[in-house]
Amino acid sequence: MSNFAVSLPEVIAVLPAAGIGSRMLADCPKQYLTVGGKTIIEHAIFSLLHHPRIQRVIVVIHPQDTQFSRLSVAQDPRISTVYGGDQRANSVMAGLQLAGQAEWVLVHDAARPCLHLDDLSRLLSITECSQVGGILAAPVRDTMKRAEPGIQAIAHTVDRQDLWHALTPQLFPLELLKLCLSRALREGVAVTDEASALEHCGYHPILVTGRSDNIKVTRPEDLALAEFYLTQRQSLNNDSL
């Protein structure tokens, strides 16, 4: 057993993968598209399982999903599956029900195949100093424009000084995330990521600076970019051997 597992709190990961990814214009959900020799979801799962502090990964799938069980990673004893709901928050809640007595839970997008181990380690380190949790995020570098309501015309430029792109994984105490998600769902709040549920309840999660190449594959052009990042990483790994 690793020193991480002995000295630091147990962390369970939840991977919501019940969406259909209609913006990809593909014949299958985006998480099952192949990039860098593996499906996107396999890359996402392996990036978590390679860290010694991640004890289990709970994959939340669509009730009609027949593809995940065919993947070799589905046979890993550290993998559990559960059916999700029609919204991300419902799917995450379904995953949390299988988390048992874990102290901390980490939620990662199934469509983010390029997570770096050092980013994950930095995020996990906040369990030693925070009771609220935090997220990987990247400072906004582009000039941001707000549009006029209902039309594609610029209303004004948004000050990017304190703007961040929210990424995943996002890490929170299990019971706190359950409480905040339940309240947000009950009150009809739009939960676009787990941090927004905590924000709704008055909490302020930590922003942990992450790499901007931790992209979410959402549109067809993202596949080529993910392929480039993964190929580049593999090349660097081979050069270091």
From Swiss-Prot:
Pathway participation: Isoprenoid biosynthesis; isopentenyl diphosphate biosynthesis via DXP pathway; isopentenyl diphosphate from 1-deoxy-D-xylulose 5-phosphate: step 2/6
Site described as Positions MEP for the nucleophilic attack, located at R160, K216
- Residue ranges annotated as coiled coil are none
Which keywords annotate this record? Isoprene biosynthesis, Nucleotidyltransferase, Transferase
User: Keyword 4Fe-4S on this protein?
Assistant: no
Q: Which reaction does it catalyse?
A: 2-C-methyl-D-erythritol 4-phosphate + CTP + H(+) = 4-CDP-2-C-methyl-D-erythritol + diphosphate
Q: Which GO terms describe its biological process?
A: isopentenyl diphosphate biosynthetic process, methylerythritol 4-phosphate pathway
- EC category name: transferase
Q: Where is this site: Transition state stabilizer?
A: R23, K30
The similarity annotation says: Belongs to the IspD/TarI cytidylyltransferase family. IspD subfamily.
Q: State the function annotated in the UniProt record.
A: Catalyzes the formation of 4-diphosphocytidyl-2-C-methyl-D-erythritol from CTP and 2-C-methyl-D-erythritol 4-phosphate (MEP).
The identity of this protein, by name, is 2-C-methyl-D-erythritol 4-phosphate cytidylyltransferase
Native source species: Yersinia pseudotuberculosis serotype O:1b (strain IP 31758)
Q: Which gene encodes it?
A: ispD
